[in-house]
Curated annotation (Swiss-Prot):
Part of the 30S ribosomal subunit. Contacts proteins S9 and S11. This is Small ribosomal subunit protein uS7. Signal peptide: none annotated. It comes from Bdellovibrio bacteriovorus (strain ATCC 15356 / DSM 50701 / NCIMB 9529 / HD100). The keyword DNA damage does not apply. The keyword Membrane does not apply. Gene3D superfamilies: Ribosomal protein S7 domain (1.10.455.10). One of the primary rRNA binding proteins, it binds directly to 16S rRNA where it nucleates assembly of the head domain of the 30S subunit. Is located at the subunit interface close to the decoding center, probably blocks exit of the E-site tRNA. One of its GO terms (cellular component) is small ribosomal subunit. GO terms for biological process: translation.
Length: 157
């Protein structure tokens, strides 16, 4: 039996504007060096940028749909079997799906060419909403990798 203490998930406080846990997690994921106020300002600025862009859709709905489009359903894990390392496709658990989607959205919005971060975020949200952009490309790469290694799926235990 393990002697290690059981780990508990931290309770995340919902964001002050929308009272939403997913938004709070995204803001925390964006945060650099503990500057939460800056991160919040950028996120809400990005939502403000989205306001006129999509007809008949609220900015929050665009964000949620973009996040849903980026979530991977399957990924590969390295598994060592008899001296050889195989890339074994496994299902992604829901909490990791969300974390990966957020990480990719933040990462690829930072690489964009727009002037300020709010515009970059808004652009990446729009691209993900329309199923294009770098975050979607990353998800497709992960799915393609899992598809090409489907032969090793029996090593999944």
């Amino acid at each position: 039996m393990s002697r290690r203490k059981k780990t508990f998930k931290r309770e995340i406080i919902p964001d002050p504007v929308f009272k939403d846990l997913v938004i709070a997690k995204f803001i925390n994921k964006m945060m650099i060096q503990g500057r939460k106020a800056t991160s919040q300002k950028l996120f809400y600025g990005a939502l403000k940028e989205l306001e006129g862009k999509v007809q008949g859709e609220e900015p929050l709905a665009v964000f949620k749909k973009a996040l849903e489009n980026v979530k991977p359903s399957i990924e590969v894990r390295s598994r060592r079997v008899g001296g050889a390392t195989y890339q074994v496709p496994v299902d992604v658990r829901p909490s990791r799906r969300l974390a990966l989607a957020m990480r990719w959205l933040v990462e690829y919005s930072r690489e964009r060419g727009e002037k300020d971060m709010a515009k970059r975020l808004a652009g990446e949200f729009l691209d993900a909403y329309n199923n294009r952009g770098n975050a979607i490309k990353k998800k497709d790469d992960v799915h393609r990798m899992a598809e090409s290694n489907k032969a090793f799926s029996h090593y999944n235990w």
